[in-house]
A protein has these predicted regions:
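Gly/Ala-rich beta-loop-alpha elbow adjacent to hydrolase catalytic centers
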Residues: 107-115, 119, 123
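Charged, glycine/proline-rich intrinsically disordered loops and linkers
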Residues: 40, 49, 56-68, 158-176, ...
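Acyltransferase
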Residues: 215-303, 311-312, 343-373
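Helix-rich "cap/lid" substructures immediately adjacent to catalytic or cofactor-binding pockets
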Residues: 2-110, 194
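Short Gly/Thr/Asp-enriched flexible loops that form oxyanion-binding sites at enzyme active sites
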Residues: 312-324
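Alpha/beta catalytic cores of group-transfer enzymes, especially the acyltransferase/condensing modules
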Residues: 20, 123-273
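Conserved small-residue
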Residues: 17-19, 48, 88, 115, ...
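Short, solvent-exposed amphipathic alpha-helical segments in soluble enzyme
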Residues: 32-33, 209-211, 320-323
Length: 378
């Protein structure tokens, strides 16, 4: 997709910002060393490094880290936060500066986990470097909480997971007083991410196996992640401490432009004054990724622009949905006809919400760091 084509697609596009992951560099080194892009990238990394240094009271040089392609770890979690947010700001700035494509010309934007803070900042509600102070101030405690936590994907072959039952079973496991488990992300109708301390995931699996007829699968991740978006964050009073910092954070008033779909609520719920409330709830509330993905389908989004280094969860979600829809509709004349029909705006209001799923194979995904390098300017 060339620059002119991407610009024309903006009215029906959504920008998707990635969150923290075990890998956070992507192609940032290439962008930093690029003869034209380099100055903007260096400026963003330098400013983010100064903010990070100020918050954690330790010298941080993100420019050197990226130039040397030195990966972050859980022990440098604060630097990972600053790096990801800086590169997201840099990528959006490059798109504007060199191609005249503005984020505000898109229909909407959203972000997974840390990405929601970047999205809200990019939409003009907060300054990016001021907003990153909040997660940076909590980074040490988040990393410490990760030491005894395990991330796992829970999925089964039925039509949809019984979310209410899962929430209740988590509470019952927590009631035993031997650790906390909770939903971190609603990935799809039949899968969620869970975060659990100690052996809570095993005990949860044992309980749910006796409560549902369908076979439930639990796949653990060997990597360590901070237990964001779960009640585990209560243990170090992280939500309230973050909220206290936000009292005096500059800006935060006015509607985001474009509208931001919040993974806290699953919809475009930001108004002129509730950005701080959303950021507070963001810390310990599950990420409603599936609800937001489905919302983009209902909004007739045709292009997803993925922002940040090496985005993974959001692109994978759309790709998996596309593959599933194509598998279900393959060979069906009726389904192929409906897929063609939903391309016509006049008939969309006449169709049920579920028909929006048929749009999944039509969505084009653009990984911004790849696109910037493929459409490189001298």
């Amino acid at each position: 997709m060339n620059p002119e084509q991407l610009k024309k697609r903006m009215p029906d596009a959504a920008f998707a910002f990635r969150g923290y992951n075990v890998t956070n560099l992507g192609r940032s080194t290439e962008l930093l060393l690029h003869v034209a892009y380099g100055p903007i990238v260096q400026s963003c990394l330098s400013e983010a490094g100064k903010v990070c240094s100020d918050v954690i009271s330790k010298k941080v040089n993100l420019v050197a880290r990226v130039r040397n392609h030195r990966a972050t770890t859980l022990q440098t979690y604060s630097e990972a936060i600053a790096l990801v947010m800086a590169m997201e700001k840099a990528q959006v700035s490059l798109l504007s500066e060199f191609f005249g494509i503005e984020l505000r010309s898109a229909k909407t934007c959203f972000g997974y986990s840390l990405g929601e803070i970047s999205a809200v900042a990019a939409a003009g509600v907060f300054d990016c470097f001021e907003a990153m102070r909040v997660p940076l101030a909590m980074a040490a405690d988040c990393a410490k909480l990760a030491e005894d936590c395990t991330l796992a994907v829970l999925f089964f072959r039925g039509e949809s997971l019984p979310l209410a039952m899962i929430r209740q079973l988590c509470l019952e496991v927590n009631q035993a007083g031997r650790g906390v488990v909770g939903i971190s992300t609603h990935l799809s109708p039949n899968s969620v991410l869970l975060m659990g301390q100690g052996d809570t995931l095993d005990r949860f699996k044992n309980v749910i196996d006796h409560c549902v007829q369908e076979r439930v699968h639990l796949r653990k991740n060997s990597k360590k992640f901070p237990p964001l978006h779960t009640p585990i964050m209560w243990e170090r009073n992280v939500p309230n401490r973050a909220a206290s910092i936000m009292h005096t954070m500059p800006d935060g008033f006015g509607l985001p432009n474009p509208p931001v779909l919040s993974l806290v609520t699953g919809k475009a719920s930001y108004n002129e004054y509730n950005a701080r409330e959303h950021m507070y709830r963001w810390i310990d509330h599950p990420q409603l990724l599936w609800e937001v993905v489905f919302e983009t389908l209902k909004m007739n989004i045709e292009t997803i622009v993925h922002v940040g280094p090496e985005p993974n969860i959001i692109p994978a979600t759309y790709s998996r949905l596309r593959d599933n829809v194509e598998a279900e509709t393959n060979g069906s004349i009726r389904m192929r006809a409906l897929t063609a029909v939903v391309q016509h705006p006049w008939i969309k209001p006449m169709l049920t919400n579920r028909t929006a799923l048929l749009r999944a194979p039509l969505i084009e995904q653009v990984v911004l760091e790849d696109w910037l390098l493929e459409n490189s300017v001298a």
